[in-house]
Amino acid sequence: MARISGVEIPNNKRVVVSLTYIYGIGLPTAQSVLKTLNISEDIRVKDLTEEQIKNISMEISKYKTEGKLRREVSLNIKRLMEIGSYRGLRHRKGLPVRGQSSKTNARTVKGPRKTVANKKK
């Protein structure tokens, strides 16, 4: 397995798909990286030369990936919570942030139901 920016990418998959295993690199970014380096998208990772892997690593190091990107996202969420914005409050309460209805659904974010017992009549 080749190691690019601290992530072991699978050998038997196409390069364009393998690069998406890196956090912060999606399909369009992977395609543009390979296009700038003139590497075919259809080639397998095991068929890459050491020089090609080194070039891909250098090109990907220009992007924010893995730890830097995760840290930036968590700091952005923390900042929203500190300034007390609406989005920050929704993050703090563990509710949907982007305007989704939460009256009936939103179970994924809210977690399992908390049932309340009825009083006997």
Curated annotation (Swiss-Prot):
<keyword id="KW-0820">tRNA-binding</keyword>
<dbReference type="GO" id="GO:0003735">
    <property type="term" value="F:structural constituent of ribosome"/>
</dbReference>
<dbReference type="InterPro" id="IPR010979">
    <property type="entry name" value="Ribosomal_uS13-like_H2TH"/>
</dbReference>
<dbReference type="InterPro" id="IPR027437">
    <property type="entry name" value="Rbsml_uS13_C"/>
</dbReference>
<dbReference type="InterPro" id="IPR019980">
    <property type="entry name" value="Ribosomal_uS13_bac-type"/>
</dbReference>
<dbReference type="GO" id="GO:0015935">
    <property type="term" value="C:small ribosomal subunit"/>
</dbReference>
<dbReference type="InterPro" id="IPR001892">
    <property type="entry name" value="Ribosomal_uS13"/>
</dbReference>
<keyword id="KW-0699">rRNA-binding</keyword>
<feature type="region of interest" description="Disordered">
    <location>
        <begin position="92"/>
        <end position="121"/>
    </location>
</feature>
<dbReference type="InterPro" id="IPR018269">
    <property type="entry name" value="Ribosomal_uS13_CS"/>
</dbReference>
<keyword id="KW-0689">Ribosomal protein</keyword>
<feature type="compositionally biased region" description="Basic residues">
    <location>
        <begin position="110"/>
        <end position="121"/>
    </location>
</feature>
<comment type="function">
    <text>Located at the top of the head of the 30S subunit, it contacts several helices of the 16S rRNA. In the 70S ribosome it contacts the 23S rRNA (bridge B1a) and protein L5 of the 50S subunit (bridge B1b), connecting the 2 subunits; these bridges are implicated in subunit movement. Contacts the tRNAs in the A and P-sites.</text>
</comment>
<dbReference type="GO" id="GO:0006412">
    <property type="term" value="P:translation"/>
</dbReference>
<dbReference type="Pfam" id="PF00416">
    <property type="entry name" value="Ribosomal_S13"/>
</dbReference>
<keyword id="KW-0687">Ribonucleoprotein</keyword>
<comment type="subunit">
    <text>Part of the 30S ribosomal subunit. Forms a loose heterodimer with protein S19. Forms two bridges to the 50S subunit in the 70S ribosome.</text>
</comment>
<comment type="similarity">
    <text>Belongs to the universal ribosomal protein uS13 family.</text>
</comment>
<dbReference type="GO" id="GO:0005829">
    <property type="term" value="C:cytosol"/>
</dbReference>
<dbReference type="GO" id="GO:0019843">
    <property type="term" value="F:rRNA binding"/>
</dbReference>
<keyword id="KW-0694">RNA-binding</keyword>
<protein>
    <recommendedName>
        <fullName>Small ribosomal subunit protein uS13</fullName>
    </recommendedName>
</protein>
<dbReference type="GO" id="GO:0000049">
    <property type="term" value="F:tRNA binding"/>
</dbReference>
